[in-house]
């Protein structure tokens, strides 16, 4: 498959210009060069509030599983849609199986992401983030010189629509990387469309109302090095909810680390081997008027094993707006109408800190 690239319209290109992240040390290189790290070396990564909430055992809550094939079947769609409604309302998070993405597409993207992060630092730095851009290799949400840092490196790419791509950020090594990203991006975009159709059904609204809520896509490929010194004191990603409409995540290897916050406690997520993970984003919470909740989540670090993942963030038109959809005339509006650009700029201008960005959209007194 030939990878598409185009010059792009101003709106599409502006998506990646909504924020920036200050340059900081590469964590993978830090681990490789320092061996057993001292407290002084990783002081900026130590999270003081990491134990503020209890961590429950894995079996404390079974993450909902949604079978896409049941949603597509007339005989089972109603029952499966009820499960989807429950998952979005009570969890803001679910696993999706029989998602339709070919095994070879998933295998290829997993292999190429692993190969990319194994490349020498100087090769990866050829795709480093540039000031004023969200794309590229580096870190994210670093907005001050004194904030605590996350124990991870990443590469972020704007993938859909193709007019918004900047191919200078797309790695040429391994030589199959671009093609793997292209195929995976298209397949996940189709999955996001299917899920949005059924999410609309669960909200009793016309699918057309959600048709423009996944027109743009960012991919973020994350690498979480092991931390032998004090893995319980650092985080791969700080607690946050996503500023997207819908996020779809694929675990690259079998190393766990993702935790979701539910009922005030952290629940470790152990995905099914055949599942993708889906979480409600802030924009869907706003649009549903709080019926569906964006999930707060974080990533913990393993003492001896690396962890890798790829997240696909689906967002509406850059120039669009998100307004709460009220089910009845008596329903009280909990969120104000927000511009997509307006919310995105706010989200990317701050460090990750729970669901703080969403407070901006809540109406006063709520």
Residue ranges and their predicted role:
Residues 1-366:
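Peripheral, non-catalytic segments flanking oxidoreductase cores
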